[in-house]
A protein has these predicted regions:
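Bacterial N-terminal signal peptides that target proteins for export
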Residues: 1-12
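Bacterial signal peptide processing site
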Residues: 24-27
């Protein structure tokens, strides 16, 4: 059972601190690693990153000076018998030289129809495709795209489950 939206957001905030610490100091040996095109099976859904590109502009959004946009196209397919509340922040991006307080690991705010919404329901057996857009330093070329499971255990934070890491090198 997935954590309620408020608890999930708090859980992600807490997990982000751990995740970002891990990204700046090397990979966690318990992470499951995947590559572009692999289908990843989580407790609630399968997802596949079908394309990743770097650009200075996407859908009218222009990257800040010194940054680039990394556009991750993915397909999600529910494997859970109940609706699952999803957030764009469920998927985070990181890079080797990233500082712990860098908020660019989260997708930019929803601004175009191609993006996955900030919050949405993934119905049983539903498939959904969209993009997540991240603004990252333009001197970076390799990224880790991460999803962390959290299970409802009666606490505000939830119990962490598996973490899935996909190594991505965007095409320019």
């Amino acid at each position: 059972k997935k954590v309620a939206p408020i608890g999930k957001r708090l859980a992600w905030v807490l997990a982000s601190a751990l995740l970002l610490t891990g990204c700046s100091s090397g990979q966690n040996d318990t992470d499951q690693h995947f590559s572009l095109g692999d289908t990843v099976s989580t407790a609630w859904f399968d997802y596949t990153v079908t394309e990743v590109e770097s650009t200075q502009e996407y859908g009218g959004y222009i990257s800040a000076q010194g940054d680039q946009l990394v556009v991750v196209e993915l397909t999600l397919k529910s494997t859970y018998p109940q609706a699952v509340t999803m957030f764009d922040s469920d998927f985070q991006i990181s890079w080797d030289s990233m500082s712990q307080d860098d908020t660019r690991c989260m997708p930019v705010e929803y601004y175009c129809d191609q993006q996955l919404p900030t919050e949405y329901e993934l119905a049983p057996r539903e498939s959904r495709s969209g993009v997540l857009v991240y603004q990252v330093p333009d001197d970076q070329s390799t990224f880790q795209f991460t999803f962390q499971e959290f299970f409802d255990d009666g606490t505000q934070e939830g119990r962490p489950g598996d973490q899935y890491v996909m190594d991505l090198t965007p095409q320019a």
